Amino acid sequence: MRSDMIKKGIDRAPHRSLLRAAGVKEEEMDKPFIGVCNSYIDIIPGHMHLNKFAEVAKEAIREAGGIPFEFNTIGVDDGIAMGHIGMRYSLPSREIICDAAETVINAHWFDGVFFIPNCDKITPGMLMASVRTNVPSVFVSGGPMEAGRTKDGKNLSLASVFEGVGAFSSGKMTREELLEIEQTACPTCGSCSGMFTANSMNSLMEMLGMALPGNGTIVATSEARHQLIKDAAKHLMNLIEKDIRPRDIITKETIDDAFALDMAMGGSTNTVLHTLAIANEAEIEYDLNRINEVAERVPYLCKISPASDYSMDDVHHAGGVAAIIKELCEIDGAIHPDRITITGKSIYENVKDAEITDDVVIRRKDNPYSPVGGLSILFGNLAPNGAVIKVGAVDPSIQIFEGEAIVYNSQEEAQQGINNGDVREGHVVVIRYEGPKGGPGMPEMLAPTSAIIGRGLGTKVALITDGRFSGASRGISIGHISPEAAEGGPIAFIENGDKIRIDLPNRTIEWLVSDEEIAKRQEGWTEPEPKVKKGYLARYSKLVTSANTGGVMKI
């Protein structure tokens, strides 16, 4: 066993002495040591219940024949961190989570790891650590929040509150109406109830084969999640016995299939960043063009908030992620159904008994919302290395958008401009110097996109940025523009009034300025001074790579 490194032989007597002090009994020294990587944090609704999950996991591990050791990671609540300096720590927290988990796993030579993530950066950070250390692993997330409800029974989510702020500022909603939404949109623990980043990643974990069916959609308050934990613990012990490791499960075909599910469900654009980072840890080279190739063969089957009013709970009762995966298995060439998973069985075997029970919530393959997937990678002279848009959350009437640039050098400036009414129909809002390096930390733009929607401009204004978006963002919102402004990318040289053309069917974004004019503007450009000059963000900005490579850290 891997853990023999710290418990076998005469030289390890001091180590065993410390293990005894930690509560390990003599008869337990020969059993597998299992790390329980938890992310319990009081201030994050998606994590406030995970202390109880860890207790269930540890008991299940003991019953399955292992010895559990719980440790914790940090986490950032993107909703609470939104719109201020806190958001600059969100994406960088992914790297801390990964590094911290790697540190504990390798320092203590665990034989296996039971990961308990939930919200936005925690799930990918933990999976990156799992793949990096390549120790047998299983994942059970904390589960989605129940949807809020209006008095007339309409679903609410956190996105409803953000968009309500925009509606209030433009006079379309009263303070009392906004307060009612604020008080009812987030009624329970769990990750926010729509197809935002957390639920996108937790759903993808099922397709990646690192979590059991139900992981993405069983609500946090359901006892069924406890059974999921118990089942996963048994599978973990089997993985250790058979020496099935994360890199046996995570292959290039697995990454393809993760994007296929993303396309079918119209997942968050952040999944592109995170899945590329996971591929990087698995030493898989993955070209952005491959994502568009996946989109061409996968239909858009399930619209969830913010693209509709359906919640993750609605998806669960319609058959869950498993039913969507099964539907994709029945489309020739859509996914690779024979891939191995943590059950020791193929992805198809995991979902073969799943059924769509509500084909309004989950459409069948012969009646999709669109014959192509809900995410697109755009290329053009404004984004030579790519940009991403959640086309599934764009009004279907918008195929081509051409407008005049209105340029802001920070999210805060843009928010003020939108609130002041400076942004009008026909504008392309440009928010730059907000990329991984320039932000630093590539903050999310949920506040500006929500303000645009709330002011009734969702089909009349586009927003482009080298930053990124919350999974709750919708509309003509294009992020991850690469190279970013801080690296001298084309977005750094856009001026007010420049024409920008977005062609969704052809997946292009073009800056309608002559090459001569672009070259003239680029003359004499120098890299701007970093916004943060001490602490973690200063180090991060020096080491982080571009969005098109997943925003990982250079070694």
Curated annotation (Swiss-Prot):
- Its GO CC terms? cytosol
Annotated residues that bind [2Fe-2S] cluster are located at: 119, 192
Q: Provide the protein name.
A: Dihydroxy-acid dehydratase
Keywords of the record: 2Fe-2S, Amino-acid biosynthesis, Branched-chain amino acid biosynthesis, Iron, Iron-sulfur, Lyase, Magnesium, Metal-binding
The enzyme class is lyase
Record PANTHER family: D-XYLONATE DEHYDRATASE (PTHR43661), D-XYLONATE DEHYDRATASE YAGF-RELATED (PTHR43661:SF3)
Q: Which GO terms describe its molecular function?
A: 2 iron, 2 sulfur cluster binding; dihydroxy-acid dehydratase activity; magnesium ion binding
Report the HAMAP family cross-referenced here: IlvD (MF_00012)
Quaternary structure annotation from Swiss-Prot or TrEMBL: Homodimer.
Reactions catalysed according to its record: (2R)-2,3-dihydroxy-3-methylbutanoate = 3-methyl-2-oxobutanoate + H2O; (2R,3R)-2,3-dihydroxy-3-methylpentanoate = (S)-3-methyl-2-oxopentanoate + H2O
Residues that the record marks as modified (N6-carboxylysine) are 121
Q: Which Pfam families match?
A: ILV_EDD_C, ILVD_EDD_N
For this chain, the family text in UniProt reads: Belongs to the IlvD/Edd family.
Q: Which top-level group of life is the source organism from?
A: Bacteria
Q: Which GO terms describe its biological process?
A: isoleucine biosynthetic process; L-valine biosynthetic process
Which gene is transcribed and translated to give this protein? Answer: ilvD
Give a short account of what the protein does: Functions in the biosynthesis of branched-chain amino acids. Catalyzes the dehydration of (2R,3R)-2,3-dihydroxy-3-methylpentanoate (2,3-dihydroxy-3-methylvalerate) into 2-oxo-3-methylpentanoate (2-oxo-3-methylvalerate) and of (2R)-2,3-dihydroxy-3-methylbutanoate (2,3-dihydroxyisovalerate) into 2-oxo-3-methylbutanoate (2-oxoisovalerate), the penultimate precursor to L-isoleucine and L-valine, respectively.
Q: What is its EC number?
A: 4.2.1.9
| InterPro entries for this protein | Dihydro-acid_dehy_C (IPR042096), DihydroxyA_deHydtase (IPR004404), DiOHA_6PGluconate_deHydtase_CS (IPR020558), ILV_EDD_C (IPR056740), ILV_EDD_N (IPR000581), IlvD/EDD_N (IPR037237)
- What is the residue range of the signal peptide feature? none
Q: Does the keyword DNA repair apply?
A: no
- Quote the pathway field: Amino-acid biosynthesis; L-isoleucine biosynthesis; L-isoleucine from 2-oxobutanoate: step 3/4; Amino-acid biosynthesis; L-valine biosynthesis; L-valine from pyruvate: step 3/4
